């Protein structure tokens, strides 16, 4: 059974809240990709209680990224739930120290699997 830490960000206020989901709600996230949108009602999350303000009924969450059990970040350009070592020059998983620097880094694909522990989402109105 999957368990995820869900970091929900509200882009209008800049506030982010972290909750943990387990069971059938967490299973609904498996197989989703970065960029997919999920209705909040489908996961059974009460945003009004969590953020302390009113939200419209049709609010969706867009998956923006996450990390696996060993801390490797998800990248939107790597397809599937696999872990790979790739040569990076910028983007998620690598911050170059000097101009033109490239380095091999291990990153996770863009699909949520049971090995993922944290999922970052933003609210879409």
From Swiss-Prot:
Keywords: Ribonucleoprotein, Ribosomal protein
Superkingdom assignment: Archaea
Molecular-function GO term, any one: structural constituent of ribosome
Classification via InterPro entries: Ribosomal_eS6, Ribosomal_eS6_arc, Ribosomal_eS6_CS
Gene Ontology cellular-component annotations: ribonucleoprotein complex; ribosome
UniProt-listed GO biological process terms: translation
Family (UniProt): Belongs to the eukaryotic ribosomal protein eS6 family.
HAMAP family in the cross-refs: Ribosomal_eS6
Name by which UniProt lists this protein: Small ribosomal subunit protein eS6
The organism of origin for this protein: Pyrococcus abyssi (strain GE5 / Orsay)
